[in-house]
Structure formats: structure tokens, C-alpha cells
């Protein structure tokens, strides 16, 4: 039987994510967690190396990258950061600061620009 409801999807997605985070290999056609995390860290290093302390940078990205940055900034476990990222609203705003202590989370999953619609129809996920 083929399940297409959100609850079934989430169950499968959780199992796959758990395996992805635990397995340090790169399965055929899939970038492993360690490599993905290293790529996100490298991108953040490149960006922060190019700016001065008064700069503002806007990055448009996916939930996976935002969740990985959340993990890096807070020390939250990769699993909990990814799970937290599952609640990211499409077009939400997450703000990080960068200084001597590294990456710091300022705002997570803010979406005041979508809350004007009373029905909530603009608030979507994934």
C-alpha cells in the first residue's frame, strides 16, 4: 500500500533523516551529512571572511542549510536542529550574527510578512 498523507511522509522522512545523520558515508547519489555540513560551514566561512563588522548579508536558502546553521550556531544536536527545521515556514526569516564568538542565532523562523492574511493560507511548509 502506498501512503501519501503527511503523517506517513513524516514517519518515513524521520527514519531517512536519522539514518542520513548517523551514517558517515556518501551513498550512491546522496551527499552524506558530514560532507553537507562541511559544505555549509565552508560557505559561511567564505561569506564572513568577505564582510566587515557593519555589513549586512542576505542569503536565500533551504531548510536544510538553515537547520545546519542552527546546529552550528547553538550546538544543538544535528538531529534536533534538523527536526526543528521541519517547522520552518516557507519564506520565513532567520537571522544570524557573526563575531569573535562565531555564528550566533538572533531570530529563527520569523514570518510577520505572512501573518497579515487572517486565514493563514500564506503560511506553508516544505
Residue ranges, per PLM feature:
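Acidic, low-complexity terminal tails and accessory targeting/binding regions
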Residues: 2-4, 34, 49, 53-56, ...
Amino acid at each position: 500500500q502506498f501512503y501519501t498523507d503527511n503523517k506517513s511522509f513524516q514517519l518515513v522522512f524521520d527514519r531517512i533523516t536519522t539514518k542520513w545523520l548517523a551514517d558517515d558515508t556518501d551513498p550512491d547519489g546522496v551527499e552524506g551529512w558530514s560532507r553537507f555540513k562541511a559544505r555549509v560551514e565552508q560557505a559561511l566561512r567564505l561569506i564572513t571572511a568577505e564582510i566587515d563588522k557593519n555589513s549586512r548579508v542576505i542569503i536565500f536558502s533551504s531548510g536544510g542549510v538553515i537547520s545546519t546553521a542552527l546546529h552550528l550556531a547553538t550546538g544543538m544536536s544535528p538531529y534536533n536542529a534538523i527536526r526543528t527545521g521541519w517547522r520552518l515556514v516557507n519564506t520565513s526569516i532567520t537571522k544570524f550574527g557573526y563575531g569573535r564568538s562565531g555564528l550566533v542565532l538572533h531570530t529563527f523562523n520569523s514570518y510577520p510578512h505572512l501573518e497579515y492574511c487572517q486565514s493563514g493560507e500564506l503560511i506553508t511548509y516544505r
